[in-house]
Structure formats: structure tokens, C-alpha cells
Amino acid sequence: MKYDTSELCDIYQEEVNVVEPMFSNFGGRTSFGGQIITVKCFEDNGLLYDLLEDNGHGRILLVDGGGSVRQALINAELAQLAVQNGWEGIVVYGAVRQVDQLAEFDLGIQAIAAIPAGCRDEGTGASDIRVNFGGVTFFSGDYLYADNTGIILSEEPLELDDNEEDEII
């Protein structure tokens, strides 16, 4: 399904929070939406491997990487794992790498920067916790919608008219 965050903001202006504009698209899917699972990890993506091994149907992994752009948290291997397990997307308050490969995956990926340096994978961090960045507080279970214009968050799923297949929401 295609999402138009501008339309959703117009329709649901009282129900959504808008994340400050700092993210860029890196995945093959330019719009995506779903229920989030939060994770906080700094320059260590070991926990992300564990989380992305789970069934991701209808879900988005929201990663608070502390805004670090010194080392990439998301790489092509993690993106492939996410696709294999049906994840809708990944939003990372941090960096990604291997961007040409990331663009080939049918997966929404938004991050604040790209850098070739990878990070460690020791598994430090925590999941299903409250995280805050971009002027918004995120909880596991919230709903996130993203496109090239931006990212919005809602406590409840937004009702989308999917009667017309070609309609962009």
C-alpha cells in the first residue's frame, strides 16, 4: 500500500505527531507503514539481528541509534533478513551503509545519513522501551507512516480507504 503522509496529516491532524525532517529514504520502498517495535542501541547492531529474525508482517523496526553517524547500524545483510521475515520497514535515528544494495530491497528504510563504516554486533541495547528523537516520543505498539515527505506517528492505526487499489493514501 502507498501512503501519503501529507494527506494523512490533513485528515488526522489531531491524531498524529510529525517527526522533525531529518530522515532520507534508502530502501526500495518509498512509502511504508505499520506498527513499531522500538529498540535503543548505540553503534552496535547485534540486537537488531535478533529482532529482525522474528516475523515482521505489518511491523516496522524503529531504532534509536543516538543519532550517531560515525558507524552504520543498518547494512545489506540486515535488510535482507528483514525482507525474508516480512518486515514493512526500518527507521533508524543513525546511519546506514551499502546504500546501493539497500535500494534494491522491497523494504522501507529511512535514516539520517549513510557512511561506509560498520559497527560492532555485541548485542548491547534494549527493545520495547520508550525512545525519543525528532521531537516525538515513540512507544512499541504505536503506528508509523513514512514516505519521501516525512514520517508521522499515531497511537492507533489510521483508517485507510483501500477500496480503490490505485489510490494513494
Curated annotation (Swiss-Prot):
<keyword id="KW-0963">Cytoplasm</keyword>
<dbReference type="InterPro" id="IPR010203">
    <property type="entry name" value="RraA"/>
</dbReference>
<dbReference type="GO" id="GO:0019899">
    <property type="term" value="F:enzyme binding"/>
</dbReference>
<dbReference type="InterPro" id="IPR036704">
    <property type="entry name" value="RraA/RraA-like_sf"/>
</dbReference>
<comment type="subunit">
    <text>Homotrimer. Binds to both RNA-binding sites in the C-terminal region of Rne and to RhlB.</text>
</comment>
<dbReference type="InterPro" id="IPR014339">
    <property type="entry name" value="RraA_gpbac"/>
</dbReference>
<dbReference type="Pfam" id="PF03737">
    <property type="entry name" value="RraA-like"/>
</dbReference>
<protein>
    <recommendedName>
        <fullName>Regulator of ribonuclease activity A</fullName>
    </recommendedName>
</protein>
<dbReference type="GO" id="GO:0005829">
    <property type="term" value="C:cytosol"/>
</dbReference>
<comment type="function">
    <text>Globally modulates RNA abundance by binding to RNase E (Rne) and regulating its endonucleolytic activity. Can modulate Rne action in a substrate-dependent manner by altering the composition of the degradosome. Modulates RNA-binding and helicase activities of the degradosome.</text>
</comment>
<dbReference type="InterPro" id="IPR005493">
    <property type="entry name" value="RraA/RraA-like"/>
</dbReference>
<comment type="similarity">
    <text>Belongs to the RraA family.</text>
</comment>
<dbReference type="GO" id="GO:1902369">
    <property type="term" value="P:negative regulation of RNA catabolic process"/>
</dbReference>
<dbReference type="GO" id="GO:0060698">
    <property type="term" value="F:endoribonuclease inhibitor activity"/>
</dbReference>
